[in-house]
Amino acid sequence: MYENLLEPIELGPARIPNRIFNPPHGTTLGSEGVVTDNLIAYHEARARGGVGLIIVEGMAFHPSFEFESAYLNAGRDTIIPGLKKLARGCREHGTSVFGQLFHAGRAVRYTHDGSKPLIYSPSDIPDDRYRVVPRPMPNEMVWEVIDSYAKAAVRLAEADLDGVEILASMGYLIAQ
């Protein structure tokens, strides 16, 4: 029934050694937007266990969504050295590594200190879950965010990641 599970697969230029993957999820193991040794150890343990692809948790990349210091931030060059080290450590076990870019838009509850954040979305309609009223994004900001996606993807490539995933579901910015 699972005859392809341990077979390699190609995703664009990346060759994934098997069909077992670790999806992106918030670990809160980052600090001040950068990769920590704890985050590297967390992913290396999964790579040692035989995971074929790790998609590193959602990374912020634009100032309109930077509200939690435990989030990784691909909007700054400081992300590159830690991601390189993470990717190198996982590759030692044959695991490919992608990074996920993430902008919540209006789908935000509160900041780490419990205050309501200043958030932006295409309109001032609040999110159904969190009910925080966003500010409508000015047209210039829309173009800045688009440009920031591209710049962040370049940083992930400079960090030797094998691919980039853009989170476009769950009511986050692109889905708004």
Label the model's feature ranges.
Residues 1-176:
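Flavin-dependent oxidoreductase catalytic cores
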